[in-house]
């Protein structure tokens, strides 16, 4: 039995390796992993079929060698398939990372472009003129009783005078002498201001509604009341808030002064009351001492009482100063005349 120097199975395997290495399609592997696996399976099946046909043609004498060589070829194919799978996986991971990095780069560029669009130069912002305040204010000198701010706003807006931005009403201050109300808790307002978004609307509202009835439903609460309003030319809401703040500060200052005066009067009253109490206590103690002394002296009790009753207090009188044109001699003559007249009368 002769041995061959040239091994056909090994040549087939090496040629297959070379063909596979030379014919590896990277683009197909990037497109789909499943397609590469399918191609590899079909190649392995074809190689197996070719090896089986060669085994049958080689004869029975070479059966053992062909089996061992076929087993080695299968192992090499298996290792080669594992290596290809690993390479495909690594290629897929690399492609995924590349795609992710590209996406992040694109998003970063888009965000930078948006930021540049939204960013305005500082010179334009500084040189930009302020918006003009085109609002108009209408003053209401009198209001219907128990009319609330939102009710006033709705009455004006239903007549087409809108939009209304702000409403301010001054609550009525009841004098302290007025009788106290118990049943009705609704507030009344003396006057008010309404700010319109447009000067034109404010002027038209004041011209059309002034000195007219409120109207509305015939049996309404404010139907017969009359509007009293005037458009304030050149008057802004900031001016109103400034005047209100000034008046509020003045009221608070007056209240503080009145409180300080009341505290001072109260302090003086308490001091006088305490002093009077102290004097009363001293007088009571003196009377008790006097009674004890009189009790010690049996016969002098009545005299002590009379002296206590007839006690007279003496006060030092100030002398009247004479003027420059008057003398003491003139005063004596006047006193003599008065004495003579009084003597004739009495």
From Swiss-Prot:
<feature type="compositionally biased region" description="Basic and acidic residues">
    <location>
        <begin position="316"/>
        <end position="328"/>
    </location>
</feature>
<comment type="similarity">
    <text>Belongs to the ESF2/ABP1 family.</text>
</comment>
<feature type="region of interest" description="Disordered">
    <location>
        <begin position="281"/>
        <end position="346"/>
    </location>
</feature>
<dbReference type="GO" id="GO:0000447">
    <property type="term" value="P:endonucleolytic cleavage in ITS1 to separate SSU-rRNA from 5.8S rRNA and LSU-rRNA from tricistronic rRNA transcript (SSU-rRNA, 5.8S rRNA, LSU-rRNA)"/>
</dbReference>
<keyword id="KW-0698">rRNA processing</keyword>
<dbReference type="GO" id="GO:0005730">
    <property type="term" value="C:nucleolus"/>
</dbReference>
<dbReference type="GO" id="GO:0000480">
    <property type="term" value="P:endonucleolytic cleavage in 5'-ETS of tricistronic rRNA transcript (SSU-rRNA, 5.8S rRNA, LSU-rRNA)"/>
</dbReference>
<dbReference type="GO" id="GO:0003723">
    <property type="term" value="F:RNA binding"/>
</dbReference>
<dbReference type="InterPro" id="IPR035979">
    <property type="entry name" value="RBD_domain_sf"/>
</dbReference>
<protein>
    <recommendedName>
        <fullName>Pre-rRNA-processing protein esf2</fullName>
    </recommendedName>
</protein>
<comment type="function">
    <text>Involved in the small subunit (SSU) processome assembly and function, and in the 18S rRNA synthesis. Required for the early cleavages at sites A0, A1 and A2.</text>
</comment>
<feature type="domain" description="RRM">
    <location>
        <begin position="136"/>
        <end position="226"/>
    </location>
</feature>
<dbReference type="GO" id="GO:0000472">
    <property type="term" value="P:endonucleolytic cleavage to generate mature 5'-end of SSU-rRNA from (SSU-rRNA, 5.8S rRNA, LSU-rRNA)"/>
</dbReference>
<feature type="compositionally biased region" description="Acidic residues">
    <location>
        <begin position="14"/>
        <end position="29"/>
    </location>
</feature>
<feature type="compositionally biased region" description="Basic and acidic residues">
    <location>
        <begin position="281"/>
        <end position="305"/>
    </location>
</feature>
<dbReference type="InterPro" id="IPR039119">
    <property type="entry name" value="ABT1/Esf2"/>
</dbReference>
<feature type="compositionally biased region" description="Acidic residues">
    <location>
        <begin position="52"/>
        <end position="68"/>
    </location>
</feature>
<keyword id="KW-0539">Nucleus</keyword>
<keyword id="KW-0690">Ribosome biogenesis</keyword>
<feature type="region of interest" description="Disordered">
    <location>
        <begin position="1"/>
        <end position="133"/>
    </location>
</feature>
<dbReference type="InterPro" id="IPR012677">
    <property type="entry name" value="Nucleotide-bd_a/b_plait_sf"/>
</dbReference>
<keyword id="KW-0694">RNA-binding</keyword>
<dbReference type="GO" id="GO:0034462">
    <property type="term" value="P:small-subunit processome assembly"/>
</dbReference>
<dbReference type="InterPro" id="IPR034353">
    <property type="entry name" value="ABT1/ESF2_RRM"/>
</dbReference>
